């Protein structure tokens, strides 16, 4: 039974390796350049870089009532 289990495990491993071999790969330098370009294009939308407008910030301290 151990040989049957190991044979099925090896079969699953072979199938997984076939799937991984078919994955399209790119060079790290190309991936880094694309990531840098994406970051530069979307920097204007990044709240950590440009901040959050005070009117739409859900985490700001609530104002107290002026009548009290």
Curated annotation (Swiss-Prot):
Keywords for the protein's UniProt record, in alphabetical order: Acetylation, Cell membrane, Lipoprotein, Membrane, Methylation, Prenylation, Transducer
Propeptide feature ranges: 66-68
Protein's membrane topology: Lipid-anchor
Modified residues (N-acetylserine): 2
Family, similarity comment: Belongs to the G protein gamma family.
Function: Guanine nucleotide-binding proteins (G proteins) are involved as a modulator or transducer in various transmembrane signaling systems. The beta and gamma chains are required for the GTPase activity, for replacement of GDP by GTP, and for G protein-effector interaction. Interacts with beta-1 and beta-2, but not with beta-3.
Residue numbers carrying Cysteine methyl ester: 65
Main localization (coarse): membrane
Gene Ontology MF term list: G-protein beta-subunit binding; GTPase activity
Name of the protein in its database record: Guanine nucleotide-binding protein G(I)/G(S)/G(O) subunit gamma-10
Top-level taxon of the source organism: Eukaryota
Listed CDD domains: GGL (cd00068)
Subcellular location: Cell membrane
């Amino acid at each position: 039974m151990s040989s049957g289990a190991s044979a099925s495990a090896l079969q699953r491993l072979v199938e997984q390796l076939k799937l991984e071999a078919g994955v399209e790969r790119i060079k790290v330098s190309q991936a880094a350049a694309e990531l840098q370009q994406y970051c530069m294009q979307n920097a204007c939308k990044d709240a950590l870089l440009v901040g959050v407008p005070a009117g739409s910030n859900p985490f700001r301290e609530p104002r107290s009532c002026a009548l009290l």
